[in-house]
């Protein structure tokens, strides 16, 4: 090794320094022929290169003339130095010869762990390492008393069968770990256990109450039909479909039959009651027919207009006109409409080929009063002004429409305008209209766009009443 590389309290004298490494000489030797001194290691390295001359004066060297210099070594070892760990905090200083003795006790000196673990650390950190960190340290378990190395103790810790622990199911019980498995499977009130019937898992202290309500709990048929037991959730289906002794209603119950008997006897009842059941079915059909008629009537009432204005489209005009020419007095009827809400119910009729004085030459229009739902609340006879219009379908942007319009005031003495049902008896109501046999001629109806796309539009408007009788 080259010379000493330490922190000297005083600068070493030059004669103590090795000419080769420039440091205070370690194990100095002297060349007796010239008197020069060197570190033994430095001189050996110099000569190993094949140069056998003194490094200082270049005179030939002879190994036999190189001797140790103990006096110089005493002087070098007496030089005062600081500890090599002074920068880390060690305050020791003393002769160089005492350094090794100091390092044997210096708390800052790095030494290997005495337990022969791979760690090297300062002497002052050794106690904590030996107590807490060293994998080779010896530890005794506080629960079972066994001795372990640090590595083995880490595996043992938290697994010791003698350690006192709480139940993992949080039932509050505390016991040695070795008893925990038996407790969890057979003693713990919070352990899970499958239901005997439905196989779902429940906490042990609730499974008893569950089993009394379990849908798969076997129960006996209350009718004692002899099938043994069925699951509770299947019992309604059993009573309804499978139990031969269950009381059932007659399949004609919706028709009015109230008979009830065991399922086994129901077939006999049905066979013996064909005529009564048929009578019930006929009565039911009759009631349903009446209800259907009433619903249709109510639906028709809802679809009837109630603002006193009717716009009636007569489609397929050409075909229907030809039919009217082939069948004299063929009459077309409009949908019914009300003069207002809770008002008079009216209907317009048309003879496309005319009737009476207009037959064969004109379009005839009439209006008649129909029996309405509110007739008892209205003034009679009907006396509201009525206006008929045949609408001109010409484009309003090209020409002003020229509707054909006629207005009349009903004659209060005319029977057609009396309250319906008070006088008509069995008369044919289709002949009771009032209007115009010659509303417009066939010749005039073709002059403008009164017929367009094979359809005509007829408008009927009724003057709104001023009051309803209370």
Swiss-Prot record:
Name of one Pfam family that matches: zf-C3HC4
Zinc finger (RING-type): 18-58
Crosslink feature (Glycyl lysine isopeptide (Lys-Gly) (interchain with G-Cter in ubiquitin)) location: 263
The protein, known as: TNF receptor-associated factor 4
One of the protein's GO biological processes: positive regulation of JNK cascade
A GO term, aspect molecular function: identical protein binding
Subunit comment: Homotrimer. Interacts with LTBR/TNFRSF3, NGFR/TNFRSF16, RPS6KB1 and TGFB1I1. Interacts with SMURF1. Interacts (via TRAF domain) with MAP3K4 (via kinase domain). Interacts with NCF1, TICAM1, IRAK1 and TRAF6, and is probably part of a complex containing TRAF4, NCF1, TICAM1, IRAK1 and TRAF6. Interacts (via MATH domain) with GP6 and GP1BB. Interacts with EGFR (via C-terminal region); this interaction promotes the formation of EGFR asymmetric dimers. Interacts with PKM; this interaction promotes PKM kinase activity.
The keyword Transcription regulation is annotated on this UniProt entry: no
Pathway assigned in UniProt: Protein degradation; proteasomal ubiquitin-dependent pathway
UniProt keyword terms in alphabetical order: Apoptosis, Cell junction, Cell membrane, Coiled coil, Cytoplasm, Cytoskeleton, Developmental protein, Immunity, Innate immunity, Isopeptide bond, Membrane, Metal-binding, Nucleus, Phosphoprotein, Repeat, Tight junction, Transferase, Ubl conjugation, Ubl conjugation pathway, Zinc, Zinc-finger
Membrane topology: Peripheral membrane protein
Tissue spec: Expressed in epithelial cells of thymus, dendritic cells of lymph node, and in the basal cell layer of epithelia such as epidermis, nasopharynx, respiratory tract, salivary gland, and esophagus.
Modified-residue entries (Phosphoserine), positions: 426
Notes on the domains: The coiled coil domain mediates homo- and hetero-oligomerization.
Coiled coil: 277-309
Domain MATH: 307-462
EC number: 2.3.2.27
Major localisation: cytoplasm
Keyword field contains Hydrolase: no
Catalytic activity: S-ubiquitinyl-[E2 ubiquitin-conjugating enzyme]-L-cysteine + [acceptor protein]-L-lysine = [E2 ubiquitin-conjugating enzyme]-L-cysteine + N(6)-ubiquitinyl-[acceptor protein]-L-lysine
Organism of this sequence: Homo sapiens
Cross-referenced PANTHER family: TNF RECEPTOR ASSOCIATED FACTOR (PTHR10131), TNF RECEPTOR-ASSOCIATED FACTOR 4 (PTHR10131:SF94)
Family: Belongs to the TNF receptor-associated factor family. B subfamily.
Swiss-Prot/TrEMBL induction comment: Up-regulated by bacterial lipopolysaccharides (LPS) and by single-stranded CpG oligodeoxynucleotide.
PTM statement from Swiss-Prot or TrEMBL: Polyubiquitinated, leading to its proteasomal degradation. Ubiquitinated at Lys-263 by the SCF(FBXL2) complex, leading to its degradation by the proteasome.
Entry's Gene Ontology cellular component terms: bicellular tight junction; cytoplasm; cytoskeleton; cytosol; fibrillar center; nucleoplasm; nucleus; perinuclear region of cytoplasm
